[in-house]
Amino acid sequence: MKSPFYRCQNTTSVEKGNSAVMGGVLFSTGLLGNLLALGLLARSGLGWCSRRPLRPLPSVFYMLVCGLTVTDLLGKCLLSPVVLAAYAQNRSLRVLAPALDNSLCQAFAFFMSFFGLSSTLQLLAMALECWLSLGHPFFYRRHITLRLGALVAPVVSAFSLAFCALPFMGFGKFVQYCPGTWCFIQMVHEEGSLSVLGYSVLYSSLMALLVLATVLCNLGAMRNLYAMHRRLQRHPRSCTRDCAEPRADGREASPQPLEELDHLLLLALMTVLFTMCSLPVIYRAYYGAFKDVKEKNRTSEEAEDLRALRFLSVISIVDPWIFIIFRSPVFRIFFHKIFIRPLRYRSRCSNSTNMESSL
């Protein structure tokens, strides 16, 4: 009988030498961030791009970020407790619920792939929304409506459900990964099984295209923000009332050039983190599909697969912090006091010194 490729594919206990600490940290951090984000969303709608005309809430971005937050929170609540229960009972997912046989592992892998794909699609929708609102405002005002924003989450969910259910229909395969607390798409090829290879490559290719499109949209938005920053530096008093930002006391004030930097830096941070967390699992899928892994290297290869899956789960942790918490008025006031105000003070001092020296 041919032995399974993965060492833990048929094991019934958690592999020794592994701890639940990492899973607990990921779960608690993700739960805290998403609950805090939901609280902030419940209090007020947050607009991502400050140059967007003021409009009654909720905005399109508000609809999109609500869908992403709910998706991330559901993913954490459905998947992380299962991992922690496996560690606590020292049982692999295949036997954690004996009455379900191997169904728990299959369901875990399905939801893992579903939430990974669904979150990435929603992140692309948010990046596209931000890029259009900054770079193509007339098109945005005419075509991007609240109804369209409200349709994103259900359409994305329906597509992700259909795509991630293909292994249940014989196209692709879900397997248990070491240390026995994870199940996911099989990312190594089997002789005589093109469907396993095909689905793994198809899933990773789709994820790669979504990541590339998201990064390009974010780079386009960053380019527009930088152009605004340069224009405000050259013409600080030429901004119209539509460009005014609400101050902490509720009044509107003309934006200063340095106030564009927090948008630019936050968008750059989001792009870097999103890319770093998404690429490992994409790389591992291609590597496993086309690289002939030797028997003696399987342990290290499975450790790399586990690390890539953990990186993928980090996306749902950083999403609420970057999109909501860091965009909240309280954090913006803190950020401006600590970073923007000192930079502005130095800029004024430098200008005064230059004027005095010229006199």
From Swiss-Prot:
Keywords: Asthma, Cell membrane, Disulfide bond, G-protein coupled receptor, Glycoprotein, Mast cell degranulation, Membrane, Receptor, Transducer, Transmembrane, Transmembrane helix
GO biological process: adenosine metabolic process; cellular response to prostaglandin D stimulus; G protein-coupled receptor signaling pathway; inflammatory response; male sex determination; mast cell degranulation; positive regulation of cytosolic calcium ion concentration; sleep
Statement: the UniProt record of this protein carries the keyword rRNA processing: no
Cytoplasmic side: 43-59, 129-150, 217-262, 332-359
Pfam families in the record: 7tm_1 (PF00001)
Organ and tissue specificity: Expressed in retinal choroid, ciliary epithelium, longitudinal and circular ciliary muscles, iris, small intestine and platelet membranes.
Glycosylation sites: 10, 90, 297
TM annotation in the entry: 22-42, 60-80, 108-128, 151-171, 196-216, 263-283, 311-331
Highest taxon of the lineage: Eukaryota
Subcellular location: Cell membrane
SUPFAM superfamilies given in the database record: Family A G protein-coupled receptor-like
Extracellular-side segments: 1-21, 81-107, 172-195, 284-310
Topology within the bilayer: Multi-pass membrane protein
Gene Ontology cellular-component terms listed: membrane; plasma membrane
Keyword match rRNA-binding: no
Disulphide bridges, residue numbers: 105-183
Molecular-function GO term, any one: prostaglandin D receptor activity
Family to which this protein belongs: Belongs to the G-protein coupled receptor 1 family.
Disease tied to this entry: Asthma-related traits 1: Asthma-related traits include clinical symptoms of asthma, such as coughing, wheezing, dyspnea, bronchial hyperresponsiveness as assessed by methacholine challenge test, serum IgE levels, atopy and atopic dermatitis.
Its biological purpose: Receptor for prostaglandin D2 (PGD2). The activity of this receptor is mainly mediated by G(s) proteins that stimulate adenylate cyclase, resulting in an elevation of intracellular cAMP. A mobilization of calcium is also observed, but without formation of inositol 1,4,5-trisphosphate. Involved in PLA2G3-dependent maturation of mast cells. PLA2G3 is secreted by immature mast cells and acts on nearby fibroblasts upstream to PTDGS to synthesize PGD2, which in turn promotes mast cell maturation and degranulation via PTGDR.
Full protein name: Prostaglandin D2 receptor
Organism whose genome encodes this protein: Homo sapiens
Phylogenetic lineage: Eukaryota, Metazoa, Chordata, Craniata, Vertebrata
Record gene name: PTGDR
